[in-house]
């Protein structure tokens, strides 16, 4: 098909009209609760160290003879929004375009829309309740169920993810057609088993919040003071889709730097390029970000459920192959 006859939108106009109405409803939800809507840059001088995120880059040509520089397209507005929190913004939300140089398919588009919000002085479970409120309002769905990562993993894999021997995890992964090496990384095994065995079984009839992921998967979340084996991190699943990922946010600049450095060490082991650490973000943590919880929710996947669509292309105006 040539570009001349491949001009029409990916989604039906009626779906785009419904999408606009839902986004307006989301904005009203947060405005009525006293959150400030913010806008942060899509381009940044820093990428992300996360081993599992592939970032788009572009070159700023810097006119007037200045040296050009590489800029990175945002994978999430998280770092900038936390800088706003540290500056005293109070509770904030944002609906923004984000970019990940990864797969395109029925559930993924490299450019997508993310809703992200932060609540100073909220603990993790209070934010889980607010995500639940939003989903019930937008999707008219039953209240969410909250279960620990340890519980659902034991329920569907039959192993305790926090205490199982690596050999047991390898055996379980191989039963599910994962060609695990004898020295396979423990987190790789846990992530495979969770995504391939657990996720397809949960959130079918109602949303489910899975909380207390292993501390080795904390990312930017705090480790639980009650149990150092788990992080104060949660994810929401519904109708076969991962919808949201939230944290009781890590505010310790020294610990965050250490995690970034570990990310880069892992990148080197995997023969991936290292990423420069975002010193501005760490400076904001050092200055004092308030204790807060935050969450990112995929708007396009939310629309897939709200509009009963199987493909992400049916809820966005122009997919990557039609942009």
From Swiss-Prot:
Family: Belongs to the class-II aminoacyl-tRNA synthetase family. EpmA subfamily.
GO molecular function: acid-ammonia (or amide) ligase activity; ATP binding; lysine-tRNA ligase activity; tRNA binding
Function: With EpmB is involved in the beta-lysylation step of the post-translational modification of translation elongation factor P (EF-P). Catalyzes the ATP-dependent activation of (R)-beta-lysine produced by EpmB, forming a lysyl-adenylate, from which the beta-lysyl moiety is then transferred to the epsilon-amino group of a conserved specific lysine residue in EF-P.
BP terms from Gene Ontology: lysyl-tRNA aminoacylation
HAMAP family: EF_P_modif_A
Lineage: Bacteria, Pseudomonadati, Pseudomonadota, Gammaproteobacteria, Pasteurellales
Known partners and oligomeric status: Homodimer.
GO cellular component entries: cytosol
Catalytic activity, reaction form: D-beta-lysine + L-lysyl-[protein] + ATP = N(6)-((3R)-3,6-diaminohexanoyl)-L-lysyl-[protein] + AMP + diphosphate + H(+)
EC identifiers of the protein: 6.3.2.-
Enzyme class: ligase
Record's protein name: Elongation factor P--(R)-beta-lysine ligase
Keyword Cell inner membrane recorded: no
PROSITE patterns in alphabetical order: AA_TRNA_LIGASE_II
Organism superkingdom: Bacteria
UniProtKB keywords: ATP-binding, Ligase, Nucleotide-binding
Residues binding substrate, per UniProt: 76-78, 118, 249
Species name: Haemophilus influenzae (strain PittEE)
Residue numbers binding ATP: 100-102, 109, 242-243, 298
UniProt key word Oxidoreductase: no
